[in-house]
From Swiss-Prot:
Highest taxon above the source species: Eukaryota
Annotated site residues (Important for interaction with integrin) in this chain: K143, R144, K149
Gene name of this polypeptide: FGF2
An annotated GO cellular component: extracellular region
Residues that bear Symmetric dimethylarginine: R4, R6, R8
Modification sites for Phosphotyrosine: Y97
SMART domains tied to this protein: FGF (SM00442)
Protein name, entry field: Fibroblast growth factor 2
Omega-N-methylarginine PTM sites in chain numbering: R4, R6, R8
Organism of provenance: Cavia porcellus
MF-aspect GO terms: growth factor activity; heparin binding; integrin binding
Amino acid sequence: VGGRGRGRGTAAAARREPGGAMAAGSITTLPALPEGGDGGAFAPGHFKDPNGGFFLRIHPDGRVDGVREKTDPHIKLQLQAEDRGVVSIKGVCANRYLAMKEDGRLLASKCVTDECFFFERLESNNYNTYRSRKYSSWYVALKRTGQYKLGSKTGPGQKAILFLPMSAKS
């Protein structure tokens, strides 16, 4: 499930409807990137944390970390809207989706699962936070060392959970 031109939904998505939409119970989700449209995908960019100056990086082998080099190709990320305020985060070069596992680890999944959706919120300080939809009290976070922080160790008000979305051109 997921990828260009195919339907995207939760692991419980039951059937494909006319026009390529997927039905998940009584909720219909549109294809992630339909032919000739962006399907809720935003222009690729970078996510920089103000804590250590790291860019969130998704590796092709599934690892997730932070790096300070703005030229690293694996920091190019694409947000895809799933619902109002809910996004998935795709590593463009890695062709993988950011996921939070049940033990709080961050990794990159080859396909979209229910662990790949995050509530995106613009905080009062103008930074964004990404809170797991499945594990609702856990956030995407980077430590000052550039390593990801376990979701179970995160919470509101921590600097580690703040990100500044930036254009890939800047």
